[in-house]
């Protein structure tokens, strides 16, 4: 599936996609955080209505295309380090980085595809 997203998505994201089932708003928190190498980092995403497990987590670095980390809420994309994990279903989802590495400093965001047009 081609999941193109604007490059300017940063920080707190309020994402919605029109579709047959009503627009679904995604709210991510925190909007920003300070962390150090070795820290455990948790980012949450809440849907305005249930989306089963139809959620992906992406990493984006400046000037680079978004990289899919987690699909179907908790499945690790091939080649992604095991320190990344995802959990949740319905409306509440979490991305966890178990031990932050220097290459992990980036923007992270969730994207639902429950009602992808």
From Swiss-Prot:
GO biological process, one term: immune response
Domain Ig-like: 23-117
Keyword field contains Disulfide bond: yes
Region: Framework-2, residue numbers: 57-71
Keyword Membrane: yes
Primary localisation category: secreted
Signal peptide: 1-22
CDD domains registered for this protein in UniProt: IgV_L_kappa (cd04980)
Any one GO CC term of the record: immunoglobulin complex
Official protein name in the record: Immunoglobulin kappa variable 1-6
Lineage start: Eukaryota, Metazoa, Chordata, Craniata, Vertebrata
């Amino acid at each position: 599936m081609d999941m193109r997203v604007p490059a300017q998505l940063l920080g707190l994201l309020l994402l919605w996609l029109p579709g047959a089932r009503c627009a679904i708003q995604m709210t991510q928190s925190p909007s920003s955080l300070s962390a150090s190498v070795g820290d455990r980092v948790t980012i949450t995403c809440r849907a305005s209505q249930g989306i089963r497990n139809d959620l992906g987590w992406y990493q984006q670095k400046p000037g680079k295309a978004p990289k899919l980390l987690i699909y179907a809420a908790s499945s690790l994309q091939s080649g992604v380090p095991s320190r990344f994990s995802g959990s949740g279903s319905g409306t509440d989802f979490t991305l966890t980085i178990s031990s932050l590495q220097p290459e992990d400093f980036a923007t992270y965001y969730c994207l639902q595809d429950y009602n992808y047009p």
